[in-house]
């Protein structure tokens, strides 16, 4: 599933080609995503100029003069720019055609993504309850420490809770916990302030590094320019269960936490 770095990579890739451009037509070949694409999307968006492209958590907000297209890549989706008129292949559900001669094409083989329309996107039901962005000053270790008091859940699902902080998905939670030396199974409420301060720093560092590398391509993620991400080459623990730790050589263990696989080093993480 594309996580925050992959979505931010997509945003950075498509924004320069969208902002200031006018939409000439929207072609929807299949409306059946996680939620149906609005039947009047073409009417609402065509003729409008794209003002900005923003990201909130794992949602892309394509802001027009009036209204915003809210897009989510789901489990396997991508948005990329192609030449106008390029024939559509299987699973290529939506084309947003631009007067510039390019079009933004949405592909989603598993159809778990979304394309919705809103006049007030930040107050949309999908976005209004989200926590702070991890790469801003609104998120820090003190927030993690305070929100974790009295919580008996494991620390990994705690930091993956979008009400606590957005965008810390399975890959980056696994990597940040390793970097901070924290066992993902530990109770969130039993971790000290000092360790949460360290964890917040590592969450920011890991996410920033992943964005710099264009995200992580494990299966079918590609950025807005059609290129894969390269952060998978930097992974220390994610997806490496049973292999030796890159730091100490101990065999990495894999357990289930919150229905997700979690890999950790029993020596480096306490």
Swiss-Prot record:
CDD domains: EcFpg-like_N. It catalyses: Hydrolysis of DNA containing ring-opened 7-methylguanine residues, releasing 2,6-diamino-4-hydroxy-5-(N-methyl)formamidopyrimidine; 2'-deoxyribonucleotide-(2'-deoxyribose 5'-phosphate)-2'-deoxyribonucleotide-DNA = a 3'-end 2'-deoxyribonucleotide-(2,3-dehydro-2,3-deoxyribose 5'-phosphate)-DNA + a 5'-end 5'-phospho-2'-deoxyribonucleoside-DNA + H(+). GO terms for molecular function: 8-oxo-7,8-dihydroguanine DNA N-glycosylase activity; class I DNA-(apurinic or apyrimidinic site) endonuclease activity; damaged DNA binding; zinc ion binding. GO terms for biological process: base-excision repair. Keywords: DNA damage, DNA repair, DNA-binding, Glycosidase, Hydrolase, Lyase, Metal-binding, Multifunctional enzyme, Zinc, Zinc-finger. It comes from the Bacteria. It comes from Pseudomonas entomophila (strain L48). The gene is mutM. SUPFAM superfamilies: Glucocorticoid receptor-like (DNA-binding domain), N-terminal domain of MutM-like DNA repair proteins, S13-like H2TH domain. Binds 1 zinc ion per subunit. Pfam families: Fapy_DNA_glyco, H2TH, zf-FPG_IleRS. Signal peptide: none annotated. The active site is at residues 2-3, 58, 260. DNA binds at residues 91, 110, 151. A zinc finger (FPG-type) spans 236-270. Belongs to the FPG family. Monomer. Its cofactor is Zn(2+). Its EC number is 3.2.2.23, 4.2.99.18. InterPro entries: DNA_glyclase/AP_lyase_DNA-bd, DNA_glyclase_Znf_dom_DNA_BS, Formamido-pyr_DNA_Glyclase, FPG_cat, MutM-like_N-ter, Ribosomal_uS13-like_H2TH, Znf_DNA_glyclase/AP_lyase, Znf_FPG/IleRS. The lineage of its organism: Bacteria, Pseudomonadati, Pseudomonadota, Gammaproteobacteria, Pseudomonadales. This is Formamidopyrimidine-DNA glycosylase.
């Amino acid at each position: 599933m594309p996580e925050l770095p992959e979505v931010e990579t997509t945003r950075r890739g498509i924004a320069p080609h969208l902002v200031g451009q006018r939409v000439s037509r929207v072609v929807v070949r299949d409306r059946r995503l996680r939620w149906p694409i609005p039947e009047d999307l073409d009417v609402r968006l065509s003729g409008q100029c794209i003002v900005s492209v923003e990201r909130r958590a794992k949602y892309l907000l394509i802001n027009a003069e009036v209204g915003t297209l809210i897009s989510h890549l789901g489990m396997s989706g991508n948005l990329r720019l192609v030449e106008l008129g390029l024939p559509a292949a299987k699973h290529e559900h939506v084309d947003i055609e631009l007067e510039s001669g390019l079009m933004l094409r949405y592909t989603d083989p598993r159809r778990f993504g979304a394309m919705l329309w809103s006049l007030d996107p930040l107050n949309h039901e999908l976005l209004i309850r989200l926590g702070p962005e991890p790469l801003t000053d609104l998120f820090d270790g003190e927030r993690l420490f305070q929100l974790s008091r009295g919580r008996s859940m494991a620390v990994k699902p705690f930091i993956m809770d979008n009400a606590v902080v957005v965008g810390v998905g399975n890959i980056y939670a696994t990597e940040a916990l390793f970097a901070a030396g924290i066992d993902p199974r530990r109770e969130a409420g039993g971790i000290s302030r000092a360790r949460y301060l360290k964890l917040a720093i590592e969450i920011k560092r890991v996410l920033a590094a992943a964005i710099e590398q264009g995200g992580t391509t494990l299966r079918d993620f590609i950025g807005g320019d059609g290129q894969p991400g390269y952060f998978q080459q930097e992974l220390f623990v994610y997806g490496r269960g049973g292999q030796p730790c890159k730091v100490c050589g101990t065999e990495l263990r894999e357990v289930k936490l919150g229905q997700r696989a979690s890999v950790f080093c029993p020596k480096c993480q306490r």
